[in-house]
UniProtKB/Swiss-Prot annotation:
One of the GO biological process terms: viral transcription
Protein known as: DNA-directed RNA polymerase RPB7 homolog
Domain notes: Contains an extended C-terminus, with no homology to characterized proteins.
Compartment(s) where it occurs, according to its Swiss-Prot or TrEMBL record: Host cytoplasm; Virion
Organism in which the protein naturally occurs: African swine fever virus (isolate Pig/Kenya/KEN-50/1950) (ASFV)
Superkingdom assignment: Viruses
Keyword check for Transmembrane: no
Family of this protein: Belongs to the Asfivirus DNA-directed RNA polymerase RPB7 homolog family.
Induction info: Expressed in the early phase of the viral replicative cycle.
Length: 335
C-alpha cells in the first residue's frame, strides 16, 4: 500500500557550522540520504514530502566532538505490506531444499520466502512468476535495509469467510469517512474496464471457488453466480451503492453481513440478512458498522488490485501459456 506517514527523529549533524548556513537545503539532503530507498519504522520510504517541524541545531555537550543534533518531524511517501496481502507477481530466484525464494515485481523491494510443499517445489521453476499471499505477521522492515523480507505462499482460493454482526446503524458522518475507500474501488473498476477482457475472464475463473465457463464472467457490479446454478437464496447488495444511500439515510446497516465464496472476491458485492443463515461454522464477529465496512472495502480493494495486477503482469497469451504449470497447481489445490 502507498501512503503518507509522519516520522519523528533526532538527526545527528557532523558539521553544525556548515549545516546552519542553509538549514532547509542541508536538512532535506540529509533526510534523503539517510531514509529514501530504505526501510524505517515498518515502511519502505519512497520520498520525503516535507519537513513539518524542526528544533534549533543543538551542540552535543557530553563530549568534545563539536557535533550537533536536531529534532525533526517530517512527512514521507511510503510503501508497506500487511499480513495476508496479495502480490500478483513474485519472480522465483531460487528453488531448492524445500524453500522457494522470490522477489516482488510490483511492490517495494521485498524478498519473499515461500516454504514449499513437495508439489510446489516440483512445479515452480526459477524465473517463473507466481501470485503470492503473505502470511500472518510475516513482513519485516529492518531499519536501513534497502528491501523488506516476508514469508508467504502461492495463493490458492479458499472457501473460508467471515460473518459480521452489526447492531448499530452506520451514521452519515461514518459513511462520509468511507468515501475515500469507495473512490479507490471505483478507480480500480475503471482501470479494470480498460484491460483485455479475455485475461480478466481467465484470472477470475482461476480464482473463483466454483466451476464456471469464461462466458459467465459478467459485470462484477451485478454478478449473482454461475448461470443455471443457484448458489444463494439471497440477492447480493452492491456495497458502493449502499454507502451512497447511507449518505442520504436511505439504508439500514443492521444485521449479518458476509462475502461468501459464491461472490467474486473482486466484486463490490456482499450479502446482508436479518438472521445468520450463512453456511459457516465460524461465530459471527460483533463489530460496528464502520469497522465492518472498512474491512469489506479493504478486502474488495485488495482483490481488485490483485486481479488488475495479474492482467498487467500476464498481458499476453504466450506469457500465460508459459505458466500453465502454475495455473494447474492452483486449480488442483482449490479446497
Amino acid at each position: 500500500m502507498i501512503d503518507q506517514k509522519i516520522f519523528e527523529i533526532t538527526l545527528n549533524i557532523d558539521d553544525p557550522a556548515n549545516f546552519c548556513t542553509n538549514v532547509e537545503a542541508h536538512l532535506l539532503k540529509e533526510l534523503e540520504n539517510i531514509y529514501v530507498g530504505k526501510c524505517f519504522k515498518n515502511s519502505f520510504i519512497i520520498s520525503i514530502t516535507g519537513v513539518i517541524q524542526r528544533s534549533p541545531c543543538f551542540i552535543m555537550r557530553t563530549n568534545n566532538s563539536g557535533r550537533g543534533y536536531m529534532h525533526v518531524r517530517f512527512s514521507a511517501l511510503v510503501s508497506y505490506l500487511n499480513a495476508f496481502d496479495l502480490i500478483a507477481a513474485v519472480k522465483i530466484i531460487k528453488n531448492d531444499n524445500n524453500i522457494i525464494l522470490g522477489e516482488s515485481l510490483l511492490t517495494e523491494p521485498v524478498t519473499i520466502v515461500i516454504p514449499s510443499s513437495e508439489s510446489q517445489n516440483n512445479v515452480a521453476e526459477v524465473g517463473q512468476i507466481v501470485p503470492v499471499q503473505l502470511a500472518n505477521s510475516s513482513v519485516y522492515y529492518i531499519p536501513g535495509r534497502q528491501q523488506a523480507s516476508a514469508t508467504g505462499s502461492i495463493f490458492i482460493p479458499k472457501h473460508t469467510f467471515s460473518v459480521y454482526h452489526v447492531q448499530e446503524e452506520l451514521t452519515q458522518e461514518q459513511a462520509l469517512n468511507l468515501t475515500k475507500l469507495v473512490n479507490v474501488i471505483e478507480t480500480l473498476l475503471d482501470s479494470r474496464s480498460k484491460k483485455d477482457f479475455k485475461h480478466i475472464c481467465f484470472f477470475e475463473k482461476l480464482y473463483y471457488t466454483y466451476p464456471i465457463s469464461s462466458d459467465e464472467i459478467l459485470d462484477l457490479k451485478i454478478w449473482k453466480g454461475p448461470k443455471g446454478k443457484e448458489v444463494s437464496r439471497l440477492k447480493p447488495c452492491n456495497v458502493l451503492s449502499f454507502l451512497y444511500d447511507a449518505l442520504k439515510n436511505k439504508s439500514s446497516s443492521l444485521g449479518f453481513w458476509a462475502r461468501p465464496p459464491d461472490l467474486f472476491k473482486s466484486s463490490p458485492l456482499a450479502y446482508q440478512q436479518d438472521n445468520n443463515s450463512f453456511n459457516t461454522t465460524e461465530l459471527p464477529i460483533i463489530c460496528s458498522a464502520e469497522v465492518m465496512f472498512v474491512t469489506l472495502l479493504k478486502e474488495i480493494i485488495n482483490y481488485l488490485q490483485f486481479m488488475n495486477d495479474l492482467c498487467d503482469t500476464f498481458n499476453n497469451e504466450q506469457l500465460i501459456k508459459r505458466h500453465e504449470n502454475i495455473w494447474m497447481l492452483i486449480e488442483q489445490r482449490k479446497i
